[in-house]
């Protein structure tokens, strides 16, 4: 059984349209409800492609709610058809912070996942690295404004292809990249 961890920064990608350099320090009064689906949509593209690969021995672990792209209007894991186990939840289900990202990553590592997949920008990558260091392989799904780190796949679909290759034994090398 392959254990895949997931952390979604629900605010990733919002900084660009708001003329910011990322979502850190985001003024939520300026965020429109329509904008909150950006990172969830990228997570869905990745997870659906993983599900379409036909891999059955896979369980996804993460924080409940927005950090796993779950909301009343949009439950990405259910839509993709992947089994999910919650390892916690953010302090405020409607507003996640860097602290929540770090706590989610640490809880996911404690669950014994094989790979941590995260959806966000360079700020999210730094938070993930701060939380887990090099203890487990991590792969980013690009969703942010600043995408300079080598830890990201070039698209949600290519991230899915990497995950599938890792699960099926076709990917045998994992390397460190600068965050």
Regions found by a protein language model. Give the residues of each.
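Short glycine-/acidic-enriched loop or helix-start segments at secondary-structure transitions
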Residues: 16-17, 72, 127-129, 150
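Hydrophobic, well-ordered secondary-structure segments
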Residues: 101, 122-125, 138, 156, ...
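Short, acidic/small-residue loops that bind anionic groups at enzyme active sites
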Residues: 115, 119, 128, 132-156
């Amino acid at each position: 059984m392959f254990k895949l961890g997931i952390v979604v920064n629900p605010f990733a990608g919002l900084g660009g349209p708001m003329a910011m350099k990322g979502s850190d320090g985001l003024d939520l009064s300026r965020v429109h409800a329509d904008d909150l689906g950006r990172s969830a949509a990228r997570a869905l593209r990745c997870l659906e492609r993983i599900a379409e690969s036909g891999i059955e021995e896979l369980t996804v672990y993460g924080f409940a709610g927005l950090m796993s792209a779950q909301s009343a209007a949009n439950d990405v894991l259910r839509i993709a058809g992947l089994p999910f186990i919650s390892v916690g939840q953010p302090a405020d289900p409607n507003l996640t912070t860097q602290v929540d990202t770090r706590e989610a990553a640490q809880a996911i590592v404690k669950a014994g996942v094989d790979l941590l997949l995260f959806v966000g920008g360079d700020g999210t990558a730094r938070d993930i690295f701060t939380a887990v260091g090099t203890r487990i392989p991590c792969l980013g799904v690009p969703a942010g404004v600043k995408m300079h780190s080598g830890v990201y796949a070039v698209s949600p679909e290519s991230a899915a292809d990497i995950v599938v290759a890792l699960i099926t034994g076709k990917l045998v090398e994992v390397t460190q990249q600068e965050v």
